[in-house]
């Protein structure tokens, strides 16, 4: 379930859809790090991902055509507890940056084609 804050036609009962984008990226990063670490023989004792997205609400609220409706940028840090060397972790990061599907979706243009269909009520 997602929601919007009070004042944005929401009840503040769940994360905003944009926060779910960050959660999807964080989850995909963690999973991809674990997969490629195992492939490279790197043992990960613990991993966590912290992300922040910067969004100017003027875009979302259609107050400025020059401001994007979504994130202007996403920054974050992946914290890894491991006996691996710094150079091995840097190589791991390069592989993850290349093969993380959600990161790939966010970094390159993706064709998205959405339609709307009217549902007819049974009483109509």
Task: Give the ranges of each region predicted by the language model.
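Extended beta-strand/beta-hairpin segments
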Residues: 1-23, 35-124
């Amino acid at each position: 379930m997602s929601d919007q804050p009070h004042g944005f036609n929401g009840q503040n009962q769940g994360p905003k859809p944009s926060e779910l984008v960050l959660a999807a990226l964080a989850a995909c990063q963690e999973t991809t790090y674990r997969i490629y670490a195992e492939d490279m023989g790197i043992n990960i004792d613990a991993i966590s991902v912290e992300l922040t997205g910067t969004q100017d609400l003027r875009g979302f609220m259609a107050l400025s055509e020059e401001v994007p409706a979504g994130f202007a940028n996403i920054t974050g840090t992946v914290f890894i507890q491991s006996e691996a060397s710094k150079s091995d972790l840097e190589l791991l990061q390069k592989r993850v940056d290349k093969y993380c599907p959600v990161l790939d979706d966010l970094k390159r243009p993706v064709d998205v084609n959405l339609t709307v269909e009217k549902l007819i009520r049974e009483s109509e």
